[in-house]
Amino acid sequence: MFKGASAINLDAKGRIAIPTRYREPLLSAHEGKLVITVDIQANCLLIYPADEWSLIEAKLLKLSDTQPTERALKRMLLGYAHEIEMDSNGRLLLPPPLRQYAQLDKKAMLVGQLNKFELWDEAQWQAQIQSAQDVIRSEDLAANERLADFSL
């Protein structure tokens, strides 16, 4: 399971280095095989171990090709999806269309989200953190059925 936010850099070839703490689990459990696609709700990328992505594909397969919203969702997620593999130095080559979608330049944030990573432009990550804090502080969490009993 992936957690924590790591500041990383993109090199001139559009590669990122996966932080060392994730490399061995990704290699041993997933053979370094990953799938990267776009997030449909934010300008970031989603990076899944290949077996986790298979679960997403199974869900996408159940969506209708005749219902416009479902078809659009499939088109976005599958149209941008790329199978990628970590090289011997723990690096991933990000396809140019994905770098463009997420507006990635040199500084980025790799954020663990249990079964996947989010990859953000560093400035956009900081802005969305502030936005998320504002939303959480303005909400009545007790009114949200799923969060009513959530405590830390």
From Swiss-Prot:
CDD domains: MraZ_C (cd16321), MraZ_N (cd16320). Pfam families: MraZ. GO terms for molecular function: DNA-binding transcription factor activity; transcription cis-regulatory region binding. Its main location: cytoplasm. Residues 5-52, 81-124 form the SpoVT-AbrB domain. GO terms for biological process: negative regulation of DNA-templated transcription initiation. PANTHER family: TRANSCRIPTIONAL REGULATOR MRAZ. It comes from the Bacteria. This is Transcriptional regulator MraZ. It comes from Shewanella amazonensis (strain ATCC BAA-1098 / SB2B). Belongs to the MraZ family. Transmembrane segments: none annotated. Forms oligomers. It is found in: Cytoplasm, Nucleoid. Keywords: Cytoplasm, DNA-binding, Repeat, Transcription, Transcription regulation. GO terms for cellular component: cytoplasm; nucleoid.
